[in-house]
């Protein structure tokens, strides 16, 4: 009888441990990691069915931005990348001149990136690129959360779009959308299956003197 009690107790402990592990796993999956572009330029690569991010503290010196655990953000696998330029102390969105490069390597690869209240302003004479470069032969999806500003100041020797998708960088596609609420939850769909209602993501993109506004749906 005592053996049966011990077995039942052991099973209960094991079941509880398994439940805690499942809850922990679900909680981890629910929150997408945020990367502050103000801390360093970002390179995102989607290849062979996976997506990774590298963030440079100083690319010329080969140094990386570190996360809260002190680990380098270097080719880190992440399927739900969220980019911000928020000051973590004040919560204020700050402008940065750091750049973002997103590469969906091959035709069947897809990069999924969320812009969440980013403010990126780049001088092309210094950056030699646009603020956000889209490259590769695959598909890139940009989700808009909150108010986003992406601008370039063009030098006549270095002219680039704020969000640049050029054939010389690959034949892939770029889709800018607003399918999620600002908290990352899916929006309701209308009769045509398009996102409707909820929070509306916004994007101001263009040159300093000639800007074009692109609003999210809903």
Model-derived regions, located:
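Bacterial Sec-dependent N-terminal signal peptides
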Residues: 1-17
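A composition-driven surface/loop motif
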Residues: 12-16, 27-218
């Amino acid at each position: 009888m005592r053996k049966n009690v011990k077995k039942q107790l052991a099973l209960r402990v094991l079941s509880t441990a398994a439940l805690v592990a499942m809850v922990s796993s679900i909680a981890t999956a629910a929150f997408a990691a945020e990367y502050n572009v103000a801390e360093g330029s970002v390179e995102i690569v989607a290849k062979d069915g996976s997506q990774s991010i590298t963030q440079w503290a100083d690319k010329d010196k080969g140094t990386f931005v570190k996360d809260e655990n002190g680990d380098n953000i270097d080719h880190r696998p992440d399927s739900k990348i969220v980019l911000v330029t928020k000051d973590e102390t004040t919560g204020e969105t700050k402008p940065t001149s750091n750049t973002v490069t997103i590469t969906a390597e091959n035709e069947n690869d897809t990069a999924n990136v969320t812009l969440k209240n980013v403010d990126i302003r780049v001088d092309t004479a210094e950056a030699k690129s646009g603020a956000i470069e889209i490259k590769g032969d695959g598909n890139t999806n940009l989700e808009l959360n909150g108010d986003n500003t992406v601008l370039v100041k063009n030098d006549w020797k270095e002219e680039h779009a704020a969000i640049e998708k050029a054939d010389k960088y690959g034949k892939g596609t770029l889709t800018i959308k607003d399918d999620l609420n600002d908290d990352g939850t899916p929006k309701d769909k209308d009769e045509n299956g398009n996102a409707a209602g909820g929070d509306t993501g916004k994007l101001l993109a263009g040159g300093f003197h000639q800007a074009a506004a692109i609003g999210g749906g809903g």
